[in-house]
Every structure is written in C-alpha cells, then in structure tokens.
Amino acid sequence: DALDDIEDEGHGTLPDGEDVHAAIETAVIERVGERGGRMHTARSRNDEVAACIRYRLREDVLEGIEATIEAREVLADVAEAHTETIMPGFTHLQPAQPTTVAHYLCSYASALARDTERLFDACERVNRSPLGAAAFAGTPFDIDRERTAELLGFDGLVENSMDAASARDFLVETTAAFATLSTTLSGLAEDLVVYSNAGYVELDDAYA
C-alpha cells in the first residue's frame, strides 16, 4: 500500500535522498515505520538499478514489437487489396520499372519482419533478472533468485553476479534494434513524400 501511495503521488513528492532508491525507502519508512527499511535486505543499489533498467526496457521493447507487428498487418492488408495495382518503381528518384503497390508495400513488411525479429532477440537478453547479485558478489542471505525473477516476470537469470550488476550491452543491442527499425520507417516515410510530390499518393493533413 505504501508503494502504491508513492506511485499515485508521483516521484515529485519524494523526500530528499542520496538517490531515488534511498528516497523511496525513506518515503516507505515514513508510512509504515522502521520495518520499511527491510525492503533493502539482500539487495544493493547496483542490482536494483540493473533490474529497474531491464524491467522498464522490457516494457518499451514489447510496446515496440506490438506496434511493429500492427504496422506490418496494415501494410499486408493494403497490399492484399492492390496485388494488381500497377505503379512505377523508382531508382535515383526516376521511374525505372513497373511493379505493383502490393510488391512495394510487402518490401517494407518484409523489412519490418526482420526488425521485429531483432526486437524479440534483444528482449530475450533484456528480460533476465540481475537481482541477487547485490553489489557484484552476491548476498549472504539465502534468497531464491529464480523465484524473484519469476515474480517480476523475467524469463530467467543473469547467472554471473558480476556480469549481472555491471552489464549494459543489452542497452546497446536494444538501441541498435530500434535504430534499425527507425531506418526502415524513415525509408517508408521518405518514399511517401516523394510519391506525394509526384502526385501518386495524397497524404492526410494530419501527416502532411
């Protein structure tokens, strides 16, 4: 209940502290007494930070996957309606070969499929629990790391405690996956600008 109250009030109401973790602990103690200090048992800010990053990043990656799949479905639906709609294919901004709207749209659907795979791959490595690593060498408390991971929705553990506390490669991998997705979407957007200038498509005012 104390944590729910803190979330409802917003982090702007937290008391001063060395960092957000200490501030939250102080806020909990203010609400439930000294027993609130036990929430830090068997944990360090090192594995807490690592867990929070992974927990939040997992949400962002899953939202990205969902949005990318929805975009692919839209492209596939429009493509299905235009399998025989002829359009020019461009090279160097010049009409070069005839193709179909379906052929063109499916090229981006294929690229988005690879983008989705990259996000799934990244999520597999993101969604590992570092908790139990403590500062970097574990904790003397006999905790069940696998149970903690299960309760927080992680698929498994970062097995090595030093790696668990210090690893940030999953951030680079996820950033690269989103950057690649952005390149795909940028290409589609640029194409639509070119096609709208040539009069082949008309963009809604909300996007123009």
Question: Whereabouts are the PLM-identified features?
Answer:
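A helix-coil-helix interface module used to build multimeric assemblies
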Residues: 1-128, 145
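Internal glycine-rich alpha/beta core junctions
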Residues: 20-38, 100-208
